Amino acid sequence: RSSASPHLFIKAVELIEQEGFISKAPVAERPSILAARELRSAFFTRAEDVSDWDVQREIAGLLHVDFDNILNKLKTGEAIARLTKDYDLAQLHGIEGSPTYVINEGRQKLFGNVSYGVIAANVNEMLASQGVDAASLC
């Protein structure tokens, strides 16, 4: 099994969002964000095979996204093209896994099981030093 199928599903939902077929919503409420959350929940809490199109179809239904539109993005190659761009960006920025946070224009990278405190310290340091040409203390 592969995680590529659920990633393609998310990319298809993103494309549909951008084309206006899904109403605009705040970031946390966008169908693509909710789809990613539902896929994680299905995988980690219910031990479902999220590469299975039936599972993805069910999630699309929960989110009121037409699964035929998703399939169209897969058939036309648009979803794989978008996912490939993400993979190319990951290589460019040296992303080796998830989660990875790239900050300070790529000069800092937080990878793996990083505590909220470490993330907050880095973000707060960046906000405090905006416009200052100095090295981060984090």
Language-model features and meaning:
Residues 1-20:
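Ordered, amphipathic secondary-structure segments that act as subunit-interaction surfaces
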